[in-house]
Design a protein with these regions (language model features):
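Short, positively charged patches
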Residues: 1-139
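Glycine-biased, small-residue-rich flexible motifs in mid-sequence functional cores and linkers
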Residues: 1, 78-363
């Protein structure tokens, strides 16, 4: 493993060139033991870079990294090993080394990236929460995000709340938690999910690393879901990377006057993302079948105890999944006061829940 780590540390050798070398020489050890002449013949290496492989300090640093991570219980994953995320192997610019600590499988049957703005609205928070409640019926699902403020943190939080393993991809060593107010969340994730990075311990926080981190988020997953995003930012970068990797992209639409939905609307308008209104839309599109649950018999028993008007409202909400109060009023022919009263009763009984913008859905 020392030579594998060392290959990722050689100055001037990027991920693509490292893979070219591995394909040519078959192992990292063989690369370091090759002559400067042989190394120079590889495209992207040249004589100056090939000399860097003869720097003994690189191997010493790699050995120190191996010892440090072993002490911390952090797994070091090499590009050629079976434990490396198989979806990421398909991405040309994927790193050759990853550092991982946690219990969630990196090769789960289903993996979704939940991404969005650091400055989410209540609507974005509600949709993230609602989506996770719908995802809890899916077996072998892992949620991936970037542990940032806003939608990222909410995705991790609500995944844990619904007992869904969640992995945070960070842009620095695993000895650092950024932002610092996510330290408690990160500890919970280590117990029920995991933290992943391409950077070894003690690596500094550098702004340039955050956009690079996004390619791992996109590459790890079958699909990326943009909850809220302005027209620029990390979520837009991640979604376009996902398309480049031939992965699905989904986005929640928002009002045209909401800047934090401008990115989502743009992705939908340009046919980069599929429009979704709920997590169920994602499950349907991906053809992921929910596991059997015991919720329906319990709900059916509750529904028989409701009056005729309440049962009608429930039927309307079930048919649409998410429905506006104005549509409920139109189809039920109830007055504003009666409708508000019935909806409140149903919400107090924990059968339905209200969403921002006078929207309602089933719990």
């Amino acid at each position: 493993m020392i030579y594998n780590i060392a290959l990722s540390l050689v100055e001037g050798i990027g991920h693509k060139t490292a893979k070219l070398l591995l394909n040519k020489f078959e192992s990292a050890e063989a690369i370091f033991k090759s002559s400067v002449k042989d190394l120079s013949s590889i495209e992207g290496v040249g004589q100056m870079r090939s000399k860097a492989f003869k720097d003994k300090q690189v191997l010493k640093q790699a050995e120190e990294i191996l010892v440090q991570h072993d002490k911390q219980g952090i797994d070091i994953l090499f590009y050629k090993n079976p434990s490396f995320p198989k979806r990421l192997v398909q991405c040309e610019d994927a790193p050759i080394i990853l550092y991982y600590k946690g219990v969630a499988p990196l090769n789960a049957q289903k993996m979704l990236a939940i991404i969005g703005t650091r400055k989410n609205t209540e609507y974005g928070a509600k949709m993230t929460e609602y989506m996770m409640e719908q995802f809890q019926v899916i077996n072998d699902l892992v949620i991936v995000s970037g542990l940032a403020l806003g939608i990222d943190g909410l995705a991790h939080k609500f995944a844990l709340k619904n007992n869904i393993p969640t992995i945070g991809v960070v842009a620095h060593g695993l000895d650092t938690i950024y932002p610092s107010n996510h330290k408690k969340l990160a500890q919970e994730m280590l117990a029920k999910g995991g933290l992943l990075s391409e950077y070894p311990l003690t690596s500094k926080i550098e702004l340039a690393n955050f956009p690079m981190r996004n390619r791992i988020v996109a590459g790890l997953c079958d699909a990326s879901i943009v909850v809220e995003s302005d027209s620029k930012g990390g979520a837009m970068i991640t979604s376009k990377l996902a398309v480049g990797y031939n992965r699905e992209v989904f986005a929640f639409p928002g009002r045209s006057i909401d800047s934090r939905s401008a990115g989502c609307n743009e992705l939908i308008k340009k046919n980069i993302a599929q429009l979704i209104e709920s997590g169920d839309d994602v499950l349907t599109y991906m053809n992921w079948t929910p596991a059997q649950t015991n919720n329906k018999p319990k709900q059916a028993l509750l529904f028989t105890q409701l009056n005729e008007q309440e049962q009608l409202l429930l039927k309307l909400i079930q048919e649409k999944e998410i429905i506006h109060a104005d549509e409920l009023k139109l189809k039920s022919a109830l007055s504003d006061s009666k409708l508000a009263s019935y909806l409140l009763q149903l919400e107090m009984q924990n059968i339905i829940k209200s969403l921002p913008g006078k929207l309602y859905c089933m719990r």
